[in-house]
Structures are given as C-alpha cells and as structure tokens.
Amino acid sequence: MENIQIDTNRIIGLYAPQNYGKSYFARHIINAISGHIPVFVYDTNFEADTNYASMKNVFAIHSVKKSEMETPAFFNKAILTLRAKQSNFYLVIEDIDKLIETSHKTKDTLEIFKLASDSRHQRIGIIYLTKEPSNIPVKLRSNTNLFLVGQFLEPTHLKYLGEMVDRKIIKTLKKPEFILFDRLTQVIQKVKIENNKMVEL
C-alpha cells in the first residue's frame, strides 16, 4: 500500500457523517504535512484539547463560552488576530457547518471565505471538517484543493458529492475509509489510516 503525502498550504475538506473519525483522520493529515508549520484548531464543541492533545505544534483557539465559538463575530476576530501574528500556518475547523449555519441566520460573512481565497497566494493551509457536505457554500468548495469523502447514504448529500466522486463508490465505503479526490490532478483514490499512515487501498 502506498503512503500518501500531502503538500503544504492546501485547502482540504473532510466530509463524513457523525462519529466517522474525521478528527482522527485530520490528525494524520497534519502528521503527513512536511515541515514544522504551526496548526491552530477551531472547535465549536470544545474537544480540540482532547482530539489533538498529544500533537506538537498544535494549538486550540479558545473562548470562555461555547455559544460564542459558534458565532461568526468571534470566529472572524480570532482569524484576523491569527493572521496578524502568523504568516505561515494551518487552520483546522471542526464542524464548520455550525459556523456556516449561524452565519446564514445572522447574515454575517465568515472570514473563512477570504482566508480560503488568499491562501492561494499566501502560506496558509486550511482543513475543514463537516458532516453536512451539501451545506458547504460554492465559494469555499471552489477553493478546496483536496476532498476526503466518507460513506454517505442520504440522497441530498450523495447528489452534492456525486458531482466529484461516483455515488456508488461513496455508498460502499466502510468506516474509516475515505475517497480522496484531488481537484488539481483529478486523481481519485480510496485511502485509510494504517500503522499511523494514510495509505492507498
């Protein structure tokens, strides 16, 4: 099985159902990124300390209140502060759909869209995790370089994901397998974590 390497400064979307192992997979993606780039985790569920505790060079973005973490205002402030202090970093956003849902309700624009656009020209990488792929706006999806898709069975999500990957393949995946789709090369691979490495099946 071939060990999969991931280039730095890319935008990666992890699409998988609840309890499929997105955070587990994200940790191994971070390990696969070469160099010593600082990684900042934004987690509205306050689980970043648990999910990424053993990793070096990984820092959680915190608020005192969980409700505040789900607001676009706090997220935007955190990102602007981060950009002012760091020129080269990776940002991991757990359950980004929660932020997107709140931004739709409040009609507040999320700084993530500008960050995703700017990342092409700056040394910024993004890994976002979601269990609601059909809720990801086109302006974020269009800037995503690499997609990792877990098993989905819901027609709404399959219709959305079917534009990238064959729906039949998605339905046959078994936890914790993912389909890796590279938008730049149009290469599609089935991957999983084995012996602490991401490998092609």
Locations of the language-model features?
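Walker A/P-loop NTP-binding active-site region of P-loop NTPases
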Residues: 17-59
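Pre-Walker A adenine-sensing motif
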Residues: 1-7
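Short coil/turn connectors at secondary-structure junctions
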Residues: 9, 36-37, 87-88
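Structural motif
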Residues: 17, 44, 64-66, 152
